[in-house]
């Protein structure tokens, strides 16, 4: 396609597209099945930036199907009383920012109308699973719950577990052990630890142990709460004889 509208006549079907065409210049015969191809981000109205597509300016232009490219996930919306618009997305996700089913849209013309069907195509799918670990007292218990949560995900897919919630500072989730135990369940496994420590300073006010003194000093420091939690977590691992995760 050039910058302006380019038309391809296939008898019953007319296809039009351009890299930056003027919507006002689009001319489509009402008696034909009209498919328009554009690349950009849809906006409702007003001014937009580069790769911006105005829905309002494409209404009532005899469009039956507006094929859009730019977003990497399938989406569809009503254009007007006659037409619909679809982002087909990408054929396969390329990372955990492109989760979910990927594929293409199959168009069929029947009785001067166009029918569209999303066809899943990717052999492997990216999944991101948030999971609240609050209340799990042991790694085996948490592992069992995670296996149940992800039981419907095929082993050929890619999975990222995002652990959330508050955990006891004495027994935080062992990310390395979970990674080792669950790695064979998927083609690729990533675990992101977004948990926070459930610390009540009153629990350590009268604790005369090295641990108590360490936690009191960290909580009294000028570090922000996130950094305090990171330091406490590393310190407690070291006190237990484990390798701190810095």
Q: Where do the model's predicted regions map?
A:
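His/Asp/Glu-rich metal-coordinating catalytic cores
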Residues: 1-86, 90-95, 99-101
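Short coil/turn segments at beta-strand junctions that form active-site/ligand-binding loops
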Residues: 32, 106, 153-157
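A conserved active-site cap/scaffold subdomain adjacent to cofactor or substrate pockets
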Residues: 69, 75-142
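Accessory, non-catalytic peripheral segments of nucleic-acid enzymes
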Residues: 111-246
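Short, surface-exposed amphipathic charged segments that create phosphate/polyanion-binding patches used
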Residues: 12-20, 103, 201-211
């Amino acid at each position: 396609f050039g910058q302006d509208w380019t038309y391809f006549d296939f008898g019953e079907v007319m296809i039009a597209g351009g890299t930056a065409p003027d919507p006002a210049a689009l001319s489509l015969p009402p008696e034909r099945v009209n498919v328009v191809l554009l690349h950009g981000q849809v906006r409702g109205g007003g001014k937009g930036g580069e790769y911006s597509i105005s829905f309002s300016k494409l209404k009532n232009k005899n469009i039956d199907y507006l094929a859009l490219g730019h977003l990497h996930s399938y989406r569809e919306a009503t254009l007007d009383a006659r037409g619909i618009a679809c982002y087909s997305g990408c054929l396969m996700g390329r990372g955990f920012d492109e989760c979910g089913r990927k594929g293409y849209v199959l168009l069929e013309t029947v009785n001067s109308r166009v029918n569209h069907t999303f066809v899943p195509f990717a052999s492997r799918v990216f999944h991101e699973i948030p999971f609240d670990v609050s209340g799990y007292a042991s790694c085996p218990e948490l592992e069992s719950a995670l296996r149940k949560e992800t039981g419907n995900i095929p082993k050929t897919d890619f999975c990222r577990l995002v652990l959330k919630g508050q955990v006891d500072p004495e027994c935080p989730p062992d990310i390395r052990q979970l990674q080792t135990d669950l790695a064979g369940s998927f083609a690729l496994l990533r675990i992101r630890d977004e948990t926070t420590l459930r610390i009540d300073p009153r629990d350590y006010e009268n604790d005369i142990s090295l641990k108590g003194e360490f936690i009191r000093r960290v909580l009294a420091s000028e570090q922000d709460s996130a950094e305090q939690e990171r330091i406490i977590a590393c310190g407690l691992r070291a006190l237990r004889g484990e390798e701190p995760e810095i």
